[in-house]
Amino acid sequence: KYAVFGESYQTIGNVSLYGKIGYVNNRKQEVNWNGMTGDCWRGINLCDSVSGNQRSEQYQLSGAFSLPVSSHWLMGSRFDYLVDLNAKDTDPRNENQWMEWKITPGVGYECGSHRLGASIFYGNRKETVDYQNIGTHTTYPFFVSYPLGYFKTLPKGENIKWYYSAQEFGGFLQEEGVYGRFRLFQQIGGNLVRQNIVSDRIQNKKEGETDGWKLDYKGIGSLVSPLNRHEWSWKVLFDKSDSYDLLQQQEENMGTWHSSG
């Protein structure tokens, strides 16, 4: 694995600017039971049982700015964009194309030794998973994995190409205060996410849906003295998701699929 990054901070007048660009090349050996780029897709994942080597290339781009609007208030925003290309060199071969972007505007307030912040974000993710058996002698099966260790075998002799998409919306509240030598930071946030999986976008054949939400709280406390620094952190997380393996029926004339449950 190797990576190259470029990062810069600039101040032009009252505006603070930040930018980052990166490239990551990674190779993994003896990979199996994992045909996805990451662990974002909660409910329904493609996989296979044959070990093989995987190579991935990742491209990252981020930018942000902040601008004071008064002696106590400031505003800013951040944008993140990522592309990940992944391929396996052994049948059954999964080729993945991942793209995601997220925009996060926010405001901050500072008064003395206390700071308050609030931000919202919207994100969009897409992944195309193309599973193929290129060799002509042996056809290996593909599997769909579900939570709690459940699996389903897909029909043999067919190549699989599924399209994953997700939309996510959420926000955070932050508070930081200094009390003598003790500093306390707290953050609470949450998000809603909707995920869809389609195997035929023209005929609208859906393979599954997932609705989820998450609430999390974290805190960091630090105590600083001339000779020592002590730091504590804690976190509480609630995460829930409902996944649906849809029942569908195909129209005889138009060929379009309709979900019934």
Region spans (language model):
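Residues that define the transmembrane beta-barrel architecture of outer-membrane proteins
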Residues: 1-4, 55-61, 92-103, 165-171, ...
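Residues on the lipid-exposed face of transmembrane beta-strands in outer-membrane beta-barrel proteins
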Residues: 4-10, 61-67, 103-109, 171-177, ...
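Outer-membrane beta-barrel channels and translocator barrels
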Residues: 11-15, 70-72, 110-112, 178-182, ...
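Short, flexible helix-coil linker/hinge segments at the edges of structured domains or between repeats
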Residues: 33-45, 121-165, 194-208
